[in-house]
Amino acid sequence: DRSSAASDVYKRQEYVMQVAQTIKEQLVALTPMTVLMSWGIKEFAATLYRDLPALRIKVNGRLHAGYVIVALNGSDYYEVYLVKGMEVECVNEEVCFDELGDVIDRAIESGTDKAEYDKFCEQERQNLYVTVVTV
């Protein structure tokens, strides 16, 4: 029956939208704003990825520019993928909601070497205060 199939598609779309909205809300609520801003976020979009409801985030981070996909799997964990062109890298397949910001940040912005990232940030801060004088 055609109306039943259309209703199923609509319900699936609604579910994907709700999951994507929940992921976004959790990310924004639990990740410091300065960290979110460092990712250079351009857009959020609800999507299906590997037949899982997901949030696609367009980012311009220090270590990754492209898309981050956060998908909710059947075990109620998030799977995090980095996508650049046709290349896909699975960052982690078992991420709890409260770890999401840290997992994404390590993958796209700060990396695993805290001292190196702190040095980079300090250099960037100093660059903001340098005045260039031209003759």
Positions of predicted regions on the chain:
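Hydrophobic, Leu/Ile/Phe/Ala-enriched alpha-helical segments that form helix-helix packing faces
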Residues: 7, 27, 31, 104-111
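Intrinsically disordered, low-complexity regulatory segments enriched in Ser/Thr/Pro
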Residues: 64-95
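Mixed-charge, Lys/Arg-enriched low-complexity segments
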Residues: 15, 87-135
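Detector for intrinsically disordered, low-structure N-terminal pre-sequences
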Residues: 8, 15-18, 69
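Single conserved hydrophobic/aromatic residue that forms the stacking wall/gate
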Residues: 1-13
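Negatively charged, low-complexity tracts enriched in Asp/Glu with abundant Ser/Thr
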Residues: 15-62
